[in-house]
Amino acid sequence: MKEQIRELLAHHPNGLRLREIAIYLRVHHFSLINILDEMKKEGIIDGRSNDDHANGEYYIIWYLVG
């Protein structure tokens, strides 16, 4: 699963939201939270927070490091 996420983010240099990653991989987004956290600790990916005030949403954009 980590390799699939890495390949997916390589094709999206501006990053993707958690739900977008889940849609591409066809998995439930809650199952990705631990995997993304592990990848962040390993230094493979990083996330930046984003606010959408118009829709009242707060989310993280995940992207490859380096």
Locations of regions flagged by a protein language model:
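Short helix-capping/hinge SLiMs at alpha-helix to coil transitions
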Residues: A10-P13
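A local structural micro-motif
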Residues: F30, G47-R48
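Pre-recognition alpha-helix immediately N-terminal to the DNA-recognition helix
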Residues: E3-L8
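Glycine-centered, phosphate/nucleic-acid-interacting loop/turn motifs that mediate DNA/RNA or nucleotide
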Residues: G43
